[in-house]
């Protein structure tokens, strides 16, 4: 990522920019009669110990240095790749205190630079050298705004009409008192339990990530085998066969790839440590929950009103549009959170550490600002693609519900194809949005970078993603089961055990899965940064780089 000097020099000369300050005084600080240079290639040779690239004392560029080249990364000036030997290996990696000192917070291990040395590419220098970030894919931001305007028009026209169906507003009056007592009992318990569960899970992930990943996979195997036995006993042979195949592939994947668990565990521990250092990223997740909650209320009101006042083809067309809008807004909110988290992790990766340029003030807010301004068009673009696929799946579901057998079969085929396509696109988009957050590029350019990464690291990406995804999914599943059981028990005095279990499951799942999604985004962001820019980690946090490379060798 640094600037390379393409000028040719004799092999006897010192590396460019690494001569001691006594050899050349900075230009403009000599008497007029002394401002001259020796002929090209005839510099006076002095024996010296070669310094690390990027740590010249009081070095200023000469006229023969090429001008700075434009770079994509717009968050801060990244240090130049180190031209040095690898740091010495770390001993006693199994000690908890050594490991925590490496992966915790804004540290990263290593020897701090000498105070007399000047860091090339400091944070303030990057602010003046690089141009302001450019707005990417702005037309999709405009299209997203126009879609909201159309939603307002459709909703206003629906509420202006008289409903065809009469609803008795007093139907549920006799249950209102019991419902309030039921809610006051369920909500505090669910929120407190969810927060305690998240605290325990993060503690376990920070200190015993490898064991957490292994036991999560054992839980997934047991769950699939349990479903298989249940459906065979129940008589649903086909479902039993499906779950047996799923159990077989999970076991095969674990046996084949279990040697990669230490690397994923290192990434997971590192991600949790960074989240603890910057807890505002968790608050960003709660903000996304609130926005989604408000959006579902607004959308649900519009959807219900449309189905009260319209019938026939008009009702069908408006419903399809509303479903598309539901998916688009939901994915925009979700991907904005992911991009915010990835931006924070990228800032930590490139700027923190003893040899780094230093973290900016409130990096989470800065990352959120970029996601909502310069990168918002790219987020809308990528979210639009997956929303169109999900809308087509909704249409295929309508075909499945058709009475015509041929249409029903075609609907099943389309639904299967679109389901697989949706999973692939969502997987791809997750890493594309990570590139958007790291480099600030457009969605198309980020997609090209993601393709390039997949060409070289697709196997490692899938393995790492599966380990992290399975760990988070099992964590969310265990919490959901506990919440549903406890919620049902608490609701027995109100004769609402079913509703209590369902409500506790819904609210608790939202709180828990939001925190776990932040952990997921953090882990894969560290993975992308490492496989794309390993030399930066070796320069800014050499001992953490040694820890990464000891568990995963980039080939």
From Swiss-Prot:
GO CC annotation: membrane
Matches recorded under Pfam families: Choline_transpo (PF04515)
Glycosylation sites noted in the Swiss-Prot or TrEMBL record: 116, 174
Keywords, sorted A to Z: Glycoprotein, Membrane, Transmembrane, Transmembrane helix
Domain of life: Eukaryota
Family designation: Belongs to the CTL (choline transporter-like) family.
Residue stretches spanning the membrane: 138-158, 182-202, 210-230, 231-251, 284-304, 313-333, 340-360, 372-392, 405-425, 472-492, 493-513
Entry-linked InterPro entries: Choline_transptr-like (IPR007603)
Keyword Glycoprotein belongs to the record: yes
GO biological process, one term: transmembrane transport
Feature: compositional bias, Pro residues: 79-90
Region (Disordered): 1-101
Record has Membrane as a keyword: yes
Compositional bias segments (type: Low complexity): 19-63
GO molecular function: transmembrane transporter activity
Bias kind Polar residues: ranges: 1-17
Protein's UniProt name: CTL-like protein DDB_G0274487
UniProt membrane topology term: Multi-pass membrane protein
Subcellular location: Membrane
